Amino acid sequence: MEINYEKVGLKVGLEIHQQLNTKRKLFCHCPTILRDDEPDGEIVRVLRPSLSEMGEVDRAALIEARKGKKFIYQFYNDTTCLVELDEEPPHPPSEEALRIALEVALLMNMNVVDVAYTMRKIVIDGSNTSGFQRTIFLARDGYIETSEGKVGITSLCLEEDAARKIEDRGDAVVYNLDRLGIPLVEISTAPDIKTPKMAKEAARRIGEILRATGKVKRGLGTIRQDINISIKDGARIEVKGVQDLDLIEKVVENEVIRQLNLLKIRDELRERNAEVVEKIFDVTEIFKDCKSKIIQNALKKKNGKVKAVLLKGFAGLVGKEIQPGRRLGTEFSDRAKVIAGVGGLFHTDELPKYGITEEEVKKLKEFVNAEENDAVIIVADEESKVDRALEAVIERAKEALIGVPEETRRALEDGNTAYLRPLPGAARMYPETDIPPIIIKKEFIEEIRANLPELPEEKFERFKKEYKLNDELAKKMVLSYYVDLFEDLCKKFKNVKPVLIATTLEGTLKEIKREGYDIDKLEDRHLEETFKALSEGKIAKEGIVEVLKGFCEFPDKSIDEILEIKGLKGLSKEEVEKIIEGIIKEHLNVVKEKGEKAYGFLMGRCMAKLRGKADGKLVNDILRKKLKEI
């Protein structure tokens, strides 16, 4: 679908959430590590919404509370404390986190506030034990450059990350407290982004600036992108949790398609004088002998019912595609699933099907007085769930008559989105009373400004000049998780070519990961020991791969133990010559027959025996010399 984004009035804003790599959490002194071992215990909580300073209840919080879920929090005795459990007041904010956040703000040309206030942001999905997230507003009015123009940075906040979701059991959600409180920066852009491509470029640029500090966490889940999208006559939609940079373009594009199609459906409904009948019909009797397994299973439940709602003028539109593979009926189903916890719904645009017969559909339509242009939605489950689900469908169908409802949606892996909750209102923020205002002195800002890191484009040019890296490798290295380690290794081992160090960090490690080795077990010391062994001639460069594999398998072993295990003890030049002479002697008939043309065959035999134990260039030089002597 070809879209003129200027014509449709596309506006996009980004919210980037990036974890900071600090020693302690933002409001306590627990370490910022995630654990996969068994927790020491768990507590159970129920959260309820309260009035804001304005005497209002946030609508998103109210929806969450109506679900009536319990929240189970897993904890560890040695890496979580009473602050995470909301049993102790917060400690003063981490100065390390504050410094990093201000560094990021200055790199994005922002104005830092003189006094920073901590606020509470209502969060009642259970991801915070307190029912709110603490956030500190630090800077405003900055900008970044893209190829399509400037993008304003409206705010930068320092805030605590949420607890880590482990499992949703339906009536209860399990969280681990190891992630709760890890410092992160929230960077919000102005709605200056006009195309999907520009959105991706802006997100990439912000990511590059964050990585330039060398003080942010890397890996899955450490950076999350939320995208605010709207078009003319549509509505603002917040898409949560886009983790893959390459997905941003598709998410924006598909959301524009969704809104355009919802507007077309609205226009068609208005032409038909469509109406949502606000009555729920009990149609259990019609489906009591239905062959549909879903309906059979629902009716076996205690108080199991089949009920329906009538949507006048909706026929053919409930089944209309609004995003690739998703229909208006999917929107109804998403809302019912989230609000009531049902498995889904049926609608007459897709029936008879799924074990529901034509005769049953006919009886259904007669019972609710549906005409040819009408659609009927049915849900089967426990009666209380069915009623809540159909109330949600009625609400969503009424919104279809208006156009595009404001929503918070979650990103799906295919670039589509699904309903998550209503868009939060302004009533969700109020002051944090346990933390005094933070005075940010000019001297403190100037000290940080004087020590700002190189921006990626500056480092790129320096890497090409100083380390003789080509454009592709320099670009990879600048954005690499290992960029600081790369420079340290180059300084320590000057007789090792920087190109070899760079290709090892950006190429070799990925190769061995693809082979199934857990490179997360590799620490900086393992790589340093590997290059030290190379520098001292203990191994040849061909042995680097096997050494690193060895450290993945035995991370607690020393370099000498790894060399012993892998059979990679380096050989002297004399020992190499002796082995090559033996190989030539063994294949003398080939040498006599082919002369110097036997080189390729012999080199293969030599490297099979000497790989990792002797430098390939040394083997090559000795072999050629010996062949000439024959």
From Swiss-Prot:
The protein's job, in short, is: Allows the formation of correctly charged Gln-tRNA(Gln) through the transamidation of misacylated Glu-tRNA(Gln) in organisms which lack glutaminyl-tRNA synthetase. The reaction takes place in the presence of glutamine and ATP through an activated gamma-phospho-Glu-tRNA(Gln). The GatDE system is specific for glutamate and does not act on aspartate.
Which Pfam family, an example, fits this chain?
A: GatB_N
* EC annotation from Swiss-Prot or TrEMBL: 6.3.5.-
Gene Ontology CC terms: cytoplasm
Q: Which UniProt keywords apply?
A: ATP-binding, Ligase, Nucleotide-binding, Protein biosynthesis
Gene Ontology biological process: glutaminyl-tRNAGln biosynthesis via transamidation; translation
Family designation: Belongs to the GatB/GatE family. GatE subfamily.
Name under which the protein is recorded: Glutamyl-tRNA(Gln) amidotransferase subunit E
| Record note on quaternary structure | Heterodimer of GatD and GatE.
Identify the NCBIfam families for this entry: gatE_arch (TIGR00134), PRK04028.1 (NF003107)
Highest classification ranks of the organism: Archaea, Methanobacteriati, Methanobacteriota, Methanomada group, Methanococci
